């Protein structure tokens, strides 16, 4: 398994979110690691769809609770399957993180299908890093709010 990691560049900033990236292109994978890591996220990147799926599956087990991912960003075709199949594989797990798919195909059907299976977005390559950051930040902001409401509800 080829795993690439980055941790927040400022060690005094506590880790808030973990991102799992699936990207076969080494240059794009390194770029995403650098940019999202510099934004303060812990990023784990995989070079193959098999490794991505295995890493995600392991992270969903209760004994690895601290290792769960908050968001998955993956090339839809790198997984060797339709993105819907990937999402379906994990639909029985309540803790599956949201997915953002990337693709070189400008296919409206692909986008509609991915969104119908729960993907937050389908971004076309070449990626606009500002668009990706907006989606990541928005998704993680909502996740943080939801967790805060759960904690407040449990204590109140």
Where do the PLM segments sit?
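Non-catalytic signal-transmission and effector/linker regions of two-component phosphorelay proteins
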Residues: 1-42, 50, 57-70, 88-92, ...
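Short, structured coil segments at secondary-structure junctions
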Residues: 39, 95, 116-118
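Active-site residues of response regulator receiver
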Residues: 70-76
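Short amphipathic alpha-helix used as the core "switch/output" element in two-component signaling
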Residues: 82-96
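Alpha4 helix (beta4-alpha4-beta5 surface) of REC/receiver domains from two-component response regulators
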Residues: 85, 105-121
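Hydrophobic/aromatic residues positioned on beta-strands within the core alpha/beta folds
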Residues: 101-102
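A Lys-centered signature of the CheY-like receiver
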Residues: 125
């Amino acid at each position: 398994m080829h795993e690439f990691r980055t941790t927040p560049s400022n060690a005094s900033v506590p880790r808030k979110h973990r991102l799992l990236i699936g990207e076969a292109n080494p240059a794009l994978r390194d770029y995403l690691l650098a940019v999202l890591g510099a934004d303060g996220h812990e990023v784990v990147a995989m070079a193959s769809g098999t490794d991505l799926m295995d890493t995600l599956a392991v992270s969903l087990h209760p004994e690895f609770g601290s290792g769960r991912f908050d968001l998955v960003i993956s090339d839809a075709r790198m997984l060797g399957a339709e993105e819907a199949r990937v999402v379906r594989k994990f639909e029985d797990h309540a803790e599956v993180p949201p997915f953002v798919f990337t693709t070189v195909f400008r296919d409206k059907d692909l986008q509609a299908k991915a969104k119908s299976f729960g993907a937050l977005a389908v971004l076309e390559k070449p990626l606009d890093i500002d668009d990706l950051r907006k989606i990541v930040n928005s998704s993680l902001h909502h996740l943080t709010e939801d967790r805060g409401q759960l904690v407040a509800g449990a204590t109140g």
